[in-house]
UniProtKB/Swiss-Prot annotation:
The record marks 194 as: Catalytic role in ketonization of the dienol substrate (substrate destabilization). This is 2-hydroxy-6-oxononadienedioate/2-hydroxy-6-oxononatrienedioate hydrolase. The lineage of its organism: Bacteria, Pseudomonadati, Pseudomonadota, Betaproteobacteria, Burkholderiales. Keywords: Aromatic hydrocarbons catabolism, Hydrolase. Its EC number is 3.7.1.14. The active site is at residue 269. It is an enzyme of class 3 (hydrolase). Pathway: Aromatic compound metabolism; 3-phenylpropanoate degradation. Belongs to the AB hydrolase superfamily. MhpC family.
């Protein structure tokens, strides 16, 4: 593997590609950094204003430095990718998008890191394309089914859906205050960037609400099929996750053929950001061994 960590910014890595979806074509945005022989794809969560870069900007450079090519996909309906109303499985839609992207880039096999919705989508991709998956890292998602201890939808999910319906700075603050364990770590610049990204694409916000109306269960439960996944999997969770409770992660570990789990203390739903240094070391070691 080779390492190239110079000039890794959102702008310098920003790219677009057109892929087939259904009877037509859609445009995907992605960030592409590094030149390694192995590729790591990172899939973001479903919050308003989310993007590959916003979710994983603290994690790109360590992976590139370790010798990987790193691709951050903006899923359809988020950031600079095309809008979409999803009346079926969002997980499977994102899995198809990832396959289309990899086919377009002529990449056969990847490791996938998925946060929340991205974890669900990684599982969907692994089930549909097992031969194209090296290792999986799943944080705060992965379709392990509903929590056995916390009423669904959770506090965090209710706030997320409320923010989609009323995209205001006050509602953003309410959601972010339970998104992470220590909300004091959220800078004004971070909050403003999230707000700007959210309001820049009101079509995405409106389409998410339309999608929920068309199909309230956007992320189907793959729990009964988890045993089909043979890829080595690292499940990472925040002990204090108020969006997707920790017991959901335990069900992933119990269901998959070859999974292990790490639980971060004093951590909410954003492990790769809240504990970035430890997370990066752990993931680089897991992928290498």
């Amino acid at each position: 593997m080779t390492s190239n960590v110079s000039a890794i910014t959102e702008a310098s890595t920003s790219k677009f590609v057109r892929i087939k979806e259904g009877d037509g074509e859609v445009q995907l945005h992605y960030n592409d950094a590094g030149q390694g022989a192995e590729t790591v794809v990172m899939l973001h969560g479903s919050g308003p204003g989310a993007s590959g870069w916003a979710n994983f900007n603290r994690n790109v450079e360590p992976l590139v430095a370790a010798g990987y090519r790193v691709i951050l996909l903006d899923c359809l309906g988020w950031s600079k990718s095309d809008p979409v109303v999803c009346d079926g499985s969002r997980s499977e839609l994102n899995a198809r998008s990832l396959k289309g992207l990899l086919d377009a880039l002529d990449i056969e096999r990847v490791h996938i890191i998925g946060n929340s919705m991205g974890g669900h989508s990684a599982v969907a991709f692994a089930l549909a394309n097992p031969q194209r998956v090296g290792k999986l890292v799943l944080m705060g998602g992965g379709t392990g089914g509903p929590s056995q201890f916390v009423p669904m939808p959770t506090e965090g999910i209710k706030l997320l859906q409320g923010l989609y319906r009323e995209p205001t700075i006050d509602n953003l603050k309410r959601m972010m205050n339970v998104f992470v364990f220590d909300a004091s770590a959220l800078t004004d610049d971070l909050m403003q960037a999230r707000l700007d990204n959210m309001l820049a694409r009101r079509d995405h916000l409106e389409n998410f609400v339309k999608s929920l109306a068309a199909n309230p269960k956007q992320f189907n439960d793959f729990g009964p099929r988890l045993g089909e996944i043979a890829a080595p999997t690292l499940v990472i969770w925040g002990r204090d996750d108020r969006f997707v409770p920790m017991d959901v992660g335990l069900r992933l570990v119990a269901g998959m053929q070859n999974a292990e789990m790490h639980i971060f203390s004093r951590c909410g739903h954003w492990a790769q950001w809240e504990h970035a240094e430890k997370f990066n070391r752990m993931v680089v070691d897991f992928l290498a061994h």
